[in-house]
UniProtKB/Swiss-Prot annotation:
Protein's recorded name: Glutamate racemase
Domain of life, source organism: Bacteria
Record InterPro entries: Asp/Glu/hydantoin_racemase (IPR015942), Asp/Glu_race (IPR001920), Asp/Glu_racemase_AS_1 (IPR018187), Asp/Glu_racemase_AS_2 (IPR033134), Glu_race (IPR004391)
The organism of origin for this protein: Lactococcus lactis subsp. lactis (strain IL1403)
PROSITE patterns associated with the record: ASP_GLU_RACEMASE_1, ASP_GLU_RACEMASE_2
Gene3D superfamilies named among the record's database cross-references: 3.40.50.1860
Disulfide bonds listed in the record: none
UniProt GO MF annotations: glutamate racemase activity
Record family assignment: Belongs to the aspartate/glutamate racemases family.
UniProtKB keywords: Cell shape, Cell wall biogenesis/degradation, Isomerase, Peptidoglycan synthesis
EC number of the protein: 5.1.1.3
Pathway assigned to this chain's UniProt record: Cell wall biogenesis; peptidoglycan biosynthesis
Active site residues of this protein: C73, C183
Name of the top EC class for this enzyme: isomerase
Amino acid sequence: MDNRPIGLLDSGVGGLTVARELLRQLPNEEIVYIGDTRRAPYGPRSREQIIAFTWDMVNFLLSKDVKMIVMACNTATAMALEIVKEKLDIPVIGVILPGASSAIQKTKTNKIGVIATQASIRSDEYHKTIARKSSAVEVYSLACPKFVSIVESNEMESEIARKVVSESLVPLIGKVDTLILGCTHYPLLRSLIQETMGKEVRLIDSGAEAVRDISVLLNYFSINGQERQPLEHRFYTTAGVNSFREIAEKWLNIGQLQIEHTEIENFNKEK
């Protein structure tokens, strides 16, 4: 047993979709969450910037004595997961492999779509991961850079969101039977995405799929949390505490959240 918290990192509020599923599936686990909202979105950034920003978040979480780090951000996973895993002696998990594996299991036509940030699409990590597991699958990748901004500005239910989603997804309509939401912000637009793609298309939430792997790792390393009350979940953001709180409280549907502003730039530097 290990009652230390699990650390989650994201470029903003998107990783809350992973946090929600983690809290639902693993009720004995405390979490520490860092959202780098000030420097979001990560999608247009260079690989070097994304790696540096990810290290800032990793080192911040290490300062909170976490027992595991979840890269609840597809862009960070694509660019920095293997680099970080090599340097740390605690488990580190990303969201790409779980999402890809689930999509392969669910597709009936072997035609899978991936929507993600520009950086994730450029990295081609989803395509490469799927190809390693199944040579029969065709992958259709599409960058949807406007989606993150809509979520970060809390406009998920606006007419602007509906218009942007419907126009952005046109290249994939009718081509795939399974669609990976390859950015943890995107499940916050799930209803609009489903409406646009059609009810017959299966949507894969990569973050939610990752929680199943988190549970496996907790058991494997014997670091599960004990049943206890109360649990102290802590959330940190580098900008916009009020908007972060509004989205977090609505999405997580739990009482008073402990949310603080923090600075992480060049935090403790890379080891």
